């Protein structure tokens, strides 16, 4: 007909509540790149996040329910990197790696740890997680045993009103400095994400952010 190409398809796709089955995603074609030109390799275990931070597009793109790959998929991707000769950092690009804690603790992390032990720890892992990681000593211990040494955490702001404003409820009412130090105490370096410019921010927000970073020892 005379309608622009893709109009009908676009309407259908934009209204769907279906998500891709990531258990069917192929192993990345690492042979298409020169890995020697990269500081780190990326793999993905899950998509989606149970939280609803107002500024974040991830839940719109991937949904609130974390969808996860099978453990053997993750190991196969690690195998493929290892076979390509990669030795070094591997970043799990999940926006919240710990969205499904039970599966991680019971299956995925123990399997990765065993895989690493069998190959004399060829990789170091980093990822992103919500601050409630600090509430789960077993999870932090298993992450370190599996080879994780760095985690990025969205701190955003030490100002409670600003956390309320952006619906970052998982950070509200917490001693965020203590949470960071707890994560660090298990051997994980904490990198932090921060935001300034909320309507609720006081004039002192820059000084408060600097003070928080210095107190927490965050990277």
Residue ranges and their predicted role:
Residues 188-193, 216-218:
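Conserved beta-strand->loop/alpha-helix structural units within folded catalytic cores of enzymes
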Residues 23-191, 198, 204-207, 211:
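Radical SAM [4Fe-4S] cluster-binding motif and immediate context
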Residues 1-21:
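Glycine-rich beta-alpha loop elements in corrinoid/cobalamin-binding modules
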Residues 5-10, 204-219:
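C-terminal accessory regions of radical SAM enzymes
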């Amino acid at each position: 007909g005379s309608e622009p190409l893709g109009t009908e398809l676009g309407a259908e796709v934009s209204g769907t509540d279906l998500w891709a089955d990531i258990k069917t995603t192929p192993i990345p074609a690492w042979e298409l790149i020169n890995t020697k030109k990269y500081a780190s390799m990326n793999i993905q275990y899950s998509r989606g996040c149970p939280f609803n931070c107002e500024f974040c597009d991830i839940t719109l793109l991937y949904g609130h329910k974390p969808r996860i790959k099978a453990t053997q998929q993750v190991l196969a991707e690690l195998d493929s990197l290892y076979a390509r000769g990669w030795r070094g950092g591997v970043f799990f690009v999940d926006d919240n790696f710990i969205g499904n804690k039970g599966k991680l603790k019971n299956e995925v992390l123990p399997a990765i740890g065993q895989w690493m032990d069998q190959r004399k720890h060829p990789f170091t892992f980093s990822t992103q997680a919500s601050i409630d990681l600090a509430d789960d000593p077993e999870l932090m211990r298993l992450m370190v045993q599996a080879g994780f040494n760095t985690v990025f955490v969205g701190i955003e702001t030490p100002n409670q009103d600003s956390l309320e404003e952006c619906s970052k409820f998982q950070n509200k009412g917490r001693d965020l400095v203590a949470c960071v130090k707890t994560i660090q105490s298990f051997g994980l370096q904490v990198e932090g994400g921060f935001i300034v410019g909320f309507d609720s921010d006081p004039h002192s927000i820059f000084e408060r952010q600097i003070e928080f970073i210095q107190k927490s020892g965050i990277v």
